[in-house]
Amino acid sequence: HVPYLAGYNAEVSEEEQLVAVIYTHFEPMALYAGTKTTLEEIAEGDKIAVPNDPVNENRALLLLQNAGLIKLPEGTTLESQCTPSDIVENQYNLDIVELNAELIPGARADVAYAVINGNNATLVNLIPNKDGLYVEAADSEAAKAYVNIVVVKPENADAQWVKDLQKVMHTQEVYDLIVNAGFAPTFTVAQ
């Protein structure tokens, strides 16, 4: 997604820079069941696993705030880099467990709830809009910011093969595949 690309480009040499050429779909981050199966079961001190990388951790904490479970400092946005130490209100005294995003699906047996990003959810057959207890909305700021992209080296941005790939990726078949996976296409079908 775009924030990840920005972070990547900030850390690599000019020769390694990449640019976005095709916008594909949004994979919502969601709060999933761990040892508890509904949000109505939430209790004092429950553990919630969140990704520990700066971009996804802030996004996960915003998701928990939007779900009404915590409060972050006023003015917190997707560009902020909040961590659990920034939580200003935690009515259930939740224990926020920071883990590598790829490990969270497998850690659900050890926590009450888990915040999992879309690509890691699909690896364990979780569909956000079906299995998520609380899901980022398809029309949210997160959906605009975290749209998945195809990237290339700048010199390839206008290459014919990129145009051909976009034409193939923006078909009705791909659109339907994305929807059936529980994600939100961010393109209109090419005519």
For each feature predicted by the language model, list its residue ranges.
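Short beta-strand->loop
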Residues: Q17-H25, V97, Y113, L123-A142
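Pocket-flanking alpha-helical
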Residues: H1-E14, T122-L126
